[in-house]
Amino acid sequence: MIDGDGYRLNVGIVICNNHGQVFWAKRYGQHSWQFPQGGIDEGETPEQAMFRELYEEVGLTKKDVKIIATSRHWLRYKLPKRLVRWDSKPVCIGQKQKWFLLRLECDESRINMQRGKSPEFDGWRWVSYWYPVRQVVSFKRDVYRRAMKEFASLAMPFRERKTKGKRKKQQRRG
């Protein structure tokens, strides 16, 4: 779905583990990495699109994750002119995204990028929380920075709680 300004309505997905790391996926047949994302179909809510994309791209279902947060606003980025398909109607000049922060609630062995019709990714790894902001393709960087900044206080407690628990145990041994 493309809005009146030429932006494709889309969802972005940040999956966090209990160590405060995020899921980082390698685009199929390429050397570029990104978060899972995908378009919102006609009649679909952003949350429905997120769960559909999560399954198609990562193989996870609603019961495998917990929604921690949704971005307050739509975040937009423009495509570089070389990537705009000028011959398609309507012309899409960029993405307008609603972002979701999810916590993985299942074992990571459930991740399966072969469930969709054509795989979007052919590799993945856990990376530190801020790593994607520095590593994503430049035209998406500001949107990533804004989404990650908005989610930081909600994602970081997973890591901090685990670390604090270890410190308390170590202090008791003392």
Swiss-Prot record:
Entry annotated with the keyword Hydrolase: yes
Transmembrane intervals: none
Function: Accelerates the degradation of transcripts by removing pyrophosphate from the 5'-end of triphosphorylated RNA, leading to a more labile monophosphorylated state that can stimulate subsequent ribonuclease cleavage.
SUPFAM superfamilies, sorted: Nudix
Organism from which the protein derives: Vibrio parahaemolyticus serotype O3:K6 (strain RIMD 2210633)
NCBIfam families in the cross-refs: PRK00714.1-1, PRK00714.1-3, PRK00714.1-4, PRK00714.1-5
MF (Gene Ontology): mRNA 5'-diphosphatase activity
Protein's UniProt name: RNA pyrophosphohydrolase
Motif, Nudix box: chain positions: 38-59
Cofactor or coenzyme needed: a divalent metal cation
Documented EC number(s): 3.6.1.-
Key words of the record: Hydrolase
